[in-house]
Amino acid sequence: MSLAVVTLKKGEGRLLKSGGLWIFDNEVASIMGSFVNGDIVLVHDFDGYPLGRGFINTNSRIVVRLLSRDENTVIDEKFFEKRVRDAWEYRKKVTDTSSCRVIFGEADFLPGFIVDKFSDVLVVQSLALGIDRYKEMLVELLKKVLAEDGIRICGVYERSDVKVRKQEGMEPYKGFIGEEFPTLVEIVENGVKYQVDVKDGQKTGFFLDQKYNRLAIQKLCKNARVLDCFTHTGSFALNAGYAGAKEVTGVDASHLAVDQATANAALNGLSDSVKFICEDVFDLLPKLEEKGEKYDVVILDPPAFTKSRSSVKNAVKGYREINLRAMKLVKDGGFLATCSCSHFMDYQLFTQTIGQAARNVHKRLRQVEYRTQAPDHPILWSADESYYLKFYIFQVCSDR
């Protein structure tokens, strides 16, 4: 059976030819042949030159997600096994694989498919219609590849409970893939223990992308007074406590997150030095300033303030506000760790926003480190969306 052919408009396809993996609806001139959304189609430029093959979905702004640049590639189980195997071999070289992101969508050439490994449990996100057809196969292939290294997976949980699926014509979904299992999973990262709630925690249950950024703050925290804002389940706060901080306060607006963070502190024997409070960070920081509170280290790990270009302006205001408030709470010569996980808040804009915040409160910033996401979340240079996490550590000094 012949595949449908997507032909691009004249002059379109430049991003695709330079390594991009997405074709948007406004780039398409015509679609010839019969297909059902989620099928594999061929892609040609305006002159009929073949550009590859991928999944089609005319319900989405991303009409085609490319799988291969060779239009003769057979997309079958053997094809997917190689992609899965390549992803795992890469992780074995670049990171501690006890808990890690095993598959990172487009950056592993498996568009829309994400898998996090927490000890012996896999958590899956399926974000695109085409890949959704293959998720059970991909899970079985991954279990097979891991088994070859002596890793037995005891359970798989799907966390596709995200709004982006609606843009693909799918409903959000979460549930077990295969047999049920206890959904609180204990992991160890940087020497710190966590209970990860893969069923009800945020996203897949734990933010593995900050692994080495959490490690980076440990050296600053011995005997320090630390404030960790947007703490979620306490990961930065617990790294500070593990490193010997004398007093750590973690703040989050979610009661569920604070309860889990408190349990994680107890799990590590840090309940005396690491405490958590449930409050909105934007409300709390001015109160702390009014009380004259000062900290050796302040950490800002907020959720994405923007998930589209249209809301970037408001996001800038939010990032500027929390950063200038945080700088006021840092002792002269103390440290600020600050980050953004929004792809649309790019490096340059984030840097400018922090600089503006520092000028507004008459602070000098001495950059200690600039970091991004952990290497199990690889940045594919031809896929801008794979680069999203910006993480700075600054020494904060008065400019007076």
Could you describe each region identified by the protein language model?
Residues 223-232:
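Conserved class I S-adenosyl-L-methionine
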Residues 335-400:
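C-terminal catalytic and target-recognition region of SAM-dependent MTase-like enzymes
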Residues 281-359, 371:
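S-adenosylmethionine
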Residues 103-116, 135-206, 215:
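Non-catalytic substrate-recognition/targeting regions of SAM-dependent transferases
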Residues 233-246:
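Conserved SAM-binding loop of SAM-dependent methyltransferases across substrates and taxa
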